[in-house]
Each structure stands twice: as C-alpha cells, then as structure tokens.
Amino acid sequence: MADKVLKEKRRLFIRSVGTGTVNSLLDELLEKRVLNQEEMEKVRDENATVMDKARALIDAVIRKGPQACQIFIGHICEDDPHLAETLRLSSGPQSGNFLKTQDSQAVVHSSPALQAMPDDLAKLALSGPKVSLKLCSPEVVERIWKEKSAEMYPIMGKSMTRTRLALIICNTEFDNLSRRAGAEVDIASMKVLLEGLGYSVEVKENLTALDMTTELKAFAARPEHRSSDSTFLVFMSHGIREGICGKKFSEKVPDVLEVNTIFQIFNTRNCPNLRDKPKVIIIQACRGENQGVVWLKDSTGTSGNSSSLAPDDFEDDAIKKAHVEKDFIAFCSSTPDTVSWRSPTTGSVFIEKLIENLQEYAWSCDLEEIFRKVRLSFELPDARAQMPTAERVTLTRRFYLFPGH
C-alpha cells in the first residue's frame, strides 16, 4: 500500500526534498483536496526550514491514508523525477513492483529543473546522456580520511543533521542584450549535479545587479549554513571584466554585480555561519552572440601596493585577509579577456565539462584536483578555444565532496 511505502521512505524524503518540490506538492494536494487551506498554510508557515516543512507534510499525508499517499507519490514521480529516483519510487498503483532497482555504483538522475524548461529543450536534454554521478563507498571515505584528515576540510555525513545549500543565479533574458540561448540546459544540469552532491538548490533567474545583491545577502543569512559544511554559488550571465551583467545592462546603464561584492557578502565578517567552510563560486560569464568573457582577476592596484610593502606590514595584512576572506575558490569559464563558448541547444562547454568531471571524480578526488582535470580537458585548443581558470583561491585544506556519503 502507498501509505506503507511512504512510511518506509519518510526519513529519506525529509533529507532529500527541495523547497520547490515541497511548494509544488502543497499546491497539488490542495487542488486535489487532500489538504485543506488551513492544513496547507500550517505546513508552509509554521515550519522554518525545508526539512521541517517536509516532515510536517509527509506526516500529514500519511495520516490521510493510502489514497492520499498515492496522489503524493504520483506527483513526485511526475514533477520531480530526480527525487523519485532517489526514493526509488514509480507512479501507478502500489504493489510488489513499486520499488525500482538501482545501480549501486552510480545514481542516474533526471532533473526536476527540466520541468520548467521549454518543451523542445526538455526533450533534447532528456534524449541525451543521463547525468550519472559516481558514489563514494564508506570504505573509500574511511581510507581517504585516515590518509589525509590533517589536511582535509571536515565533511558532514548524510546521517548527521546536514543542511547544505547552493544558489544558482542565471540571467537568460535581457532588456538590451541578446538572449543566452541554451542557458536552460545549464540550469537543469547544474541543479541535478548539486542535488546529487547533497545540496538543496535555489535557482534565481533574470535579475538586476541590485536584485542579485539582495538575493546573495538573503542566502548568506540563511540559518541552515550553521549546520552545513560548505556552499556553492553558481553565476551564469553575460559579463564584462568588472562583473556579472544584470538584465538591464547596456552601454548607458551599468547594471553590473561587481565580483568583490560576492566575496564581501560571504566573508567571515558578513557570513559567520560559513566561517572555515569551503565557499565555491562557479562563473560562466558570456558576451553577446553566444560568446562570453571572463572578467574576474585580482585588482592590479592591490597587487602593486602589496609588492611594495615591508615584510612586517605584509605579514599583518596577510593575517587580516586570512581571517576576513578565507576558504574561497572561484572557478571561471576562461581566462580574462578571452571568450567562453555556449551552444544554444546543449548549453555552455565549460558547464558541461565541469559536470562531467565532477560526476566522474568527486568520489575520489578533492575539488582543486577536479578543477585541474577540467582544465586538462581544454588543453588542446580548437576553433572554440577557452581555458578555465581558478581565481582568488583561499582554500587552506582539501575539499572532498564524497557523493553518497
């Protein structure tokens, strides 16, 4: 029976479901009259975190009986295939064939973000290779930890109360610049990857620079970071050297989110809940006509001043910066002043290669080693040459993702 299945999957559902799916389930259950308005608002408004909302929601549905549970399961399978795969669910009446078999060596995901894509892009993404993330066995985790624990960032396991968060900001539509065709594929693929790595993913689209700043500050203030071990920030937009273009950018309207603003919002002073935890910034910045430019680099003025300091002054300055700005790494789609390439049908080359390498090596390699492998995949230039680069790196330890752990 469906209620028995939900009881068995309750704990995994609470740990795995994202905000978007919780809200979608609430709407569906209200429409199907499984929940009334008061019950829906109680779940939504009286619980602070996504996990609390998920717990209240599934418990309320289980109490409603098998038919309510069947509607609940059917909506998950239709609206969030990734979650359905994670829970090993299938739609249809619940019987002995309800649970699906799953490869123990890899998890094959179908992105919930595909539901929001145009039909033609959704069909294209689904017809291509599925996103397959190699998992890390407990034995491998134990071996790596024994060998390298002194130089590793502490990682919280899924069995702990871990609330990893990630934020994707993608500008596709602009008032004065060309549409970034193919960006929908990047959003879907990156969301699936980060969810597979254990992050609850927020996606924000088509924002001005001010909107981006507001969203970043709100994300930095999230209490879940206190019980997390890391975060990912992904930016995809048109860009110039000075920063990320907002949707109103033009030659006359400097609607740009400066790079330094991102680091300031998430530094130790402004985001203490992420102190001593890896903060990974992924940047795919595009120019018009399916081309892009990477703009992030150290300020030449700062570099010049640093080189002229006396040793004692330099030491003081370094200590201060280590406390305020630490544990960051920004991985950009190309070196400064060179273009990045994006297909209008399959998405950005950089995002595609990054995802492929994380899928293949996150179970055994630390993040900086994976980024090196991404650069290696671009080593032989062709007509669409670009070279990804890591910038403003202040990671002091190795960061292992250990997917599945």
From Swiss-Prot:
Q: Name one Pfam family in it.
A: CARD
Gene3D superfamilies recorded: 3.40.50.1460, Death Domain, Fas
Instruction: Print the keywords alphabetically.
Output: Apoptosis, Cell membrane, Cytoplasm, Hydrolase, Membrane, Phosphoprotein, Protease, Thiol protease, Ubl conjugation, Zymogen
Q: Please verify whether the record's keywords include Hydrolase.
A: yes
What's a single GO BP term from this record?
A: pyroptotic inflammatory response
- CDD domains reported for this sequence: CARD_CASP1-like (cd08325), CASc (cd00032)
Q: Which residues form the signal peptide?
A: none
Give, as one word, the top-level EC class: hydrolase
Chief subcellular location equals cytoplasm
The record's subcellular locations are: Cytoplasm; Cell membrane
Q: Which InterPro entries match?
A: CARD, Caspase-like_dom_sf, Caspase_cys_AS, Caspase_his_AS, DEATH-like_dom_sf, Pept_C14, Pept_C14_caspase, Pept_C14_p10
Please give the Gene Ontology molecular function terms for this protein.
Answer: cysteine-type endopeptidase activity
Pro-piece positions: 1-119, 299-317
Sites bearing Phosphoserine, chain numbering: 303
Gene Ontology CC annotations of this record: AIM2 inflammasome complex; IPAF inflammasome complex; NLRP1 inflammasome complex; NLRP3 inflammasome complex; plasma membrane
Q: Quickly give the catalysed reaction.
A: Strict requirement for an Asp residue at position P1 and has a preferred cleavage sequence of Tyr-Val-Ala-Asp-|-
Give start and end of each CARD domain.
Answer: 1-91
> Per the similarity annotation, which family is this?
Belongs to the peptidase C14A family.
Protein purpose: Thiol protease involved in a variety of inflammatory processes by proteolytically cleaving other proteins, such as the precursors of the inflammatory cytokines interleukin-1 beta (IL1B) and interleukin 18 (IL18) as well as the pyroptosis inducer Gasdermin-D (GSDMD), into active mature peptides.
The molecule here is called Caspase-1
UniProt organism field: Equus caballus (Horse)
